[in-house]
């Protein structure tokens, strides 16, 4: 009878656990153990442990069972069989020993007052269960987020054994004989089920993120050639067709700030390319630059009353934080936008904005009066881009977190590259961020192959030409070390030199032949891995910006190569100054 009643209580806890784990906010909480997350977890599991106490089964002094809906108080001579230890154990495994001990204290204190100020030992035993369960759980986790099923069962048995030991000492072993087996089974099964539900949700989320990242990368790969042409009706139509072909949306559209550029799918009869943007939803997104989701026709607000589009997500496309258009995805019929579609579209919009910025920068460079400077500043090595994309694609299958990290580093590299395409000079902080993003991607491709270090005695707001470090670091990565797999060191140094700063990049590579070194920076060379064009352009930019005193210098022997130049000792006063001449 006791076992049946306890399983009923377990069912209550499992229903609450399912509702809790189904909440995305709770799943986000358990990924970090900061003070804020700890407090929220304590509140949640504190409520659970109180519910466990008041839904328990009262055991009278004659060992008869009393079932009441809610046990607010019991006689000091009576005992209680409940799921308190189960909740404390689960709290410890999810939040660690700190959360487990506090939840145990809450449960023990509540049990003390529930028992008419008797059973103070429950406070000590419950706190001890929380600490021991949390410590053992942390020890067993190793590289996994949570212990395995067998380990959870072991922890549950240990936790319940601690509780039974206190009950036996302070209440009597006859009671322990009556409840120990049901409580052991209950605690082990409940903890296992709770963790299984949680791990299933987390695993599904991780797989979903990996699939989303893969989809975004595939669409990025296919749309790149079109978006770099800019937002034109032709490029927009090609992009919309690709998105429509690879997703389950019923309609896809692209606009500039005023007109529809392309609309593929349902609604193409009245959302016509070349005509003004019709829906209030799209107009508001373009106006304030904030993404919006509509789950019904009224929210879309299309003036055509026969429009079949029923839900939509509209995301702004931005270049340098200015909205230049909108990406629109629609469902028809009864389908609504889920979090999956929302994340996909937001990710696509960020990538598309970067691609548009790349294309516009290239076009502006062709028309700029300082084309020689602009051309180099806007260059993004296509081989580096596609190698990085392939690396990320490979990481998706084995480590989605590393794939997201690589994608963020690639995004940082593109952003700083595009900023360099707009500015004549950047701060040392910006250039160093560019170098770090480049090296982080390279290190993901070739773990442990390169070691980059800095020795800088200059303010972060010191100004230097865009790519003034990145070109030299990339040159070392591509040419200095040949096939050597390890012990490849690159050192970036910036030191005061009178009214100048001396900027140098050195490596411990295999050196440069005498026939080539005299040509570097002056003219292109015939080499299998490059022509030295980037060095020539950098040298020309240094001359144009600062004069011949700042030209590139090279020294090399069998122990490595050093490249250096000098720039005036001036600190940038306006961080947002753009070179628009």
Swiss-Prot record:
Q: Which ranges carry the Histidine kinase domain?
A: 356-571
Q: Which EC number applies?
A: 2.7.13.3
Q: Which Pfam families match?
A: 5TM-5TMR_LYT, HATPase_c, His_kinase
Q: Which organism is it from?
A: Streptococcus agalactiae serotype V (strain ATCC BAA-611 / 2603 V/R)
What Gene Ontology terms for biological process does this UniProt record contain? cell wall organization
Cite a single GO MF annotation: ATP binding
**Which keywords has UniProt assigned to this entry?**
ATP-binding, Cell membrane, Kinase, Membrane, Nucleotide-binding, Phosphoprotein, Transferase, Transmembrane, Transmembrane helix, Two-component regulatory system
The job of this chain, per UniProt, is described as: Member of the two-component regulatory system LytR/LytS that probably regulates genes involved in cell wall metabolism.
Q: Where is the GAF domain?
A: 231-355
Q: What is this protein called?
A: Sensor protein LytS
**What does the entry list under GO cellular component?**
plasma membrane
